[in-house]
A protein has these predicted regions:
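Catalytic/regulatory signature loops of cyclic-dinucleotide turnover enzymes
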Residues: 39-63, 79-90, 114, 284, ...
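Catalytic core regions of nucleotide second-messenger enzymes
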Residues: 1-15, 30, 53, 118, ...
Length: 330
């Protein structure tokens, strides 16, 4: 479509269409049935329009697969909501290793969902949780289970670990700073706030989200730590370190994958580590899978590593055995 002028400004308009058809040949006698069919056709056309936008097509005809996809999506949302309500999700914990001592310093809490015997990927159910707003309850569930794990390990004689708990932009956007539910849970579970690190993505710290500083300040004042996840994958990352009270940077796996073979990645990671040392910020390298990667990171002065080289995320009842085995090996 050609652009046109409004007030001397060129405007470009695009159209996306969804098409639905009624193919039954016989006449429709009932007015109620006419209205029912019309509503169905409109709904199908809206669904086709939505699918056309998702794939970037100018138009799409409705097909049954679109309806099946929506029904499956809605069923999964309902099942997730019930799973959160019934406390059916699990939390696994991935060890984070001190590079110099080869001992566990931290764990990252990672939520897992087994739906009718099958694991559902977090990449699938976390967006569903945000869309349905059940992410608030889910986040509180993860924090509560993390605190319970801390108390369990404490009873076994382990009281030195920090646990990272992820928080999304949506959770911050919906958060009520006048009733800090996260700190309430930590207090309720009788956990030292210094053992909890809230792990955020750069989107939480974006310039337009200045109100999030109040929440971060509350958490820091209580003694919690703040970790910035996936550092370097967004934009203007350096400004966040000046504006927000960040304790730890987590280097994204994409920087680590080829650090032992790509001199550019190695130089970039070393620069970030050196900068962090000057600022008094610790660095965690994520996605470490090879001994060669570990060697480069250790030589560069990285503080902590996380990844399958040491361990996958573990159920809570397997942590003690892992700690014993690691101590025996190192």
């Amino acid at each position: 479509m050609e652009p046109f002028l409004i007030g001397g400004i060129s405007q470009q308009v695009s159209v996306t269409l969804g098409v639905s058809t009624y193919q039954q040949a016989r006449s429709i006698s009932s007015q109620d049935r006419v209205e029912k069919i019309a509503r169905r056709l409109v709904r199908q056309a809206e669904l086709a329009t939505l699918n056309a936008k998702q794939v970037g097509a100018p138009f799409l005809h409705f097909c049954k697969e679109m309806d099946d996809k929506v029904k499956k999506h809605n069923l999964l949302v309902e099942q997730l909501t019930q799973a959160v309500k019934n406390d059916e999700l699990e939390v696994h914990f991935q060890p984070i290793i001190d590079v110099q001592s080869n001992t566990v310093a931290k764990f990252e809490s990672l939520v897992r969902w087994r739906n009718h015997g099958q694991w559902v990927s977090p990449a699938v159910f976390i967006p569903l949780a945000e869309e349905s707003r059940v992410i608030i309850e889910l986040g509180e569930l993860v924090l509560r289970k993390t605190c319970q794990q801390i108390k369990y390990l404490e009873a076994q004689g382990y009281n030195q670990f920090v646990f990272n708990v992820n928080r999304s932009l949506f959770e911050f956007t919906e958060f009520n700073p006048h009733r800090n539910a996260w700190l309430e849970i930590i207090t309720e579970q009788n956990v030292n706030p210094s053992q909890i690190s809230f792990e955020l993505t750069e989107s939480v710290l974006a310039p337009e989200n200045t109100n999030h500083l109040e929440v971060l300040t509350q958490l820091k004042s209580a003694g919690c730590l703040i970790s910035l996840d996936d550092f370097g994958t967004g934009y203007s990352s350096l400004s966040y370190l000046r504006r927000f009270p960040v304790d730890v940077l987590k280097l994204d796996k994409s920087f680590i994958d080829e650090i032992h073979t790509n001199s550019g990645d190695e130089a970039l990671v070393k620069s970030i580590i050196q900068m962090s040392q000057v600022l008094g910020i610790k660095v965690v390298a994520e996605g470490v899978e090879l001994q060669q990667q570990l060697a480069v990171l250790k030589e560069a002065g990285c503080d902590f590593i996380q990844g399958y080289y040491f361990s996958k995320p573990l159920p809570g009842d397997e942590i003690q055995a892992f700690l014993t085995q690691l101590a025996r090996e190192h």
